[in-house]
Amino acid sequence: MSRIGKRPIPVPAGVTVAIDGSAVTVKGPKGELSRVLPADIVVSQEGAELLVKRPSDEERHKALHGLTRTLVANMVEGVTTGFKRVLEITGVGYKAEIKPYGALLSLGFSHQIEYKAPQGVQITAPNPTTVVIEGASKEHVGQVAAEIRSLRKPEPYKGKGVKYQGEVVRRKAGKAGGK
């Protein structure tokens, strides 16, 4: 049995879980998330815990068992505490401004880039070189962070660009300025 899949998912107080066939909806203080899970995998609620069960030991069911448990656990965590990604902007003149629709990014191009945040994701900038992305869905928060980072990935010579907080950019030596 999957080691991850067989662990029960604790449901904290203030979170309600509705299971309708293969659809699971989780409501909590940070919002509401719903997802249609694979039809073979069964999610059941017993008291303040959710259990994920698989019908057989087929390879496909084993793979889906742990995945489904992790997806549901992320939904529960998202509606209780939420998820957060922090991006750092490095470079002369590189900055981010928060607008009502999302973010206005100056990343060294001849124009500024407008990034529209999807619904359920909040973008804030505590200072012009830091962007904080928060939301209930781990997928959406990670996708928005990846899209903003892809606008100007950190380059290896000077390290300019957008990177995740704590990301290490491998630096390269420039041209050897010898004779």
UniProtKB/Swiss-Prot annotation:
Function recorded in the entry: This protein binds to the 23S rRNA, and is important in its secondary structure. It is located near the subunit interface in the base of the L7/L12 stalk, and near the tRNA binding site of the peptidyltransferase center.
One record GO biological process: cytoplasmic translation
Similarity comment: Belongs to the universal ribosomal protein uL6 family.
Entry annotated with the keyword Ribonucleoprotein: yes
Keyword flag Heme: no
Assembly with partners or alone: Part of the 50S ribosomal subunit.
InterPro entries in alphabetical order: Ribosomal_uL6-like, Ribosomal_uL6-like_a/b-dom_sf, Ribosomal_uL6_a/b-dom, Ribosomal_uL6_bac-type, Ribosomal_uL6_CS
Lineage: superkingdom: Bacteria
Molecular-function annotations in GO: rRNA binding; structural constituent of ribosome
UniProt protein name: Large ribosomal subunit protein uL6
PANTHER family according to UniProt: 60S/50S RIBOSOMAL PROTEIN L6/L9, LARGE RIBOSOMAL SUBUNIT PROTEIN UL6M
GO cellular component: cytosolic large ribosomal subunit
Keywords: Ribonucleoprotein, Ribosomal protein, RNA-binding, rRNA-binding
Disulfide bonds listed in the record: none
